[in-house]
């Protein structure tokens, strides 16, 4: 399904290895090259949507990220889309608040104290100008949207995994952005 890209230790490495092996044997793996290229583009798509929403005025905005690991049920952040998002947000002058049920320690190891490490998903949303769903953990599927909306400075939700229903979220008073729709 549409999303903000894949990561992890196996699939990205395997795709690169297949491309390289084919090249060494005189072949071009155009489909795999396209897969790799599109995956890298997808990792920036939420950032681009955020820029468009705020007319590129992101300096000093507070952005919350739900999910840091490359997939749910792990703390593995290898090639995770969250790393690219965090770097882009910090480089443009955003304040970043993050929460992941398992990958907080790994995130701190990778990026240090340049972000705020929230105690839970509600703490991450506190005073946020926008909330980005990056990893589709089960606990993010049914939050108390009233609590989230009240906690946020502006109720803007960027759904990087298309787990929410646009109509439902918008009826709750959020501006909703998703992938591919």
Residue positions per predicted region:
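Structural/interface elements that position substrates and couple domains in central-metabolism enzymes
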Residues: 1-181
């Amino acid at each position: 399904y549409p999303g903000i890209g894949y990561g992890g230790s196996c699939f990205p490495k395997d795709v690169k290895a297949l491309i390289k092996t084919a090249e060494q044997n005189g072949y071009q793996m155009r489909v795999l090259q396209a897969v790799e290229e599109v995956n890298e583009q997808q990792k920036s798509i939420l950032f681009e949507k955020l820029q468009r929403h705020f007319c590129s005025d992101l300096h000093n905005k507070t952005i919350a990220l739900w999910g840091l690991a490359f997939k749910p049920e792990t703390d593995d952040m290898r090639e995770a889309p969250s790393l690219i998002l965090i770097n882009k947000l910090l480089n443009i002058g955003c304040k970043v608040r993050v929460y992941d049920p398992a990958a907080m320690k790994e995130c701190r190891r990778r990026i240090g104290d340049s972000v705020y490490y929230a105690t839970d998903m509600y703490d991450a949303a506190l005073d946020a100008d926008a909330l980005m769903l990056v990893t589709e953990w089960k606990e993010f599927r049914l939050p108390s949207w009233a609590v989230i909306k009240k906690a946020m400075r502006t109720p803007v939700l960027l759904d990087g995994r298309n787990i929410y229903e646009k109509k439902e979220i918008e009826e709750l008073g959020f501006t909703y952005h998703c992938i591919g729709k």
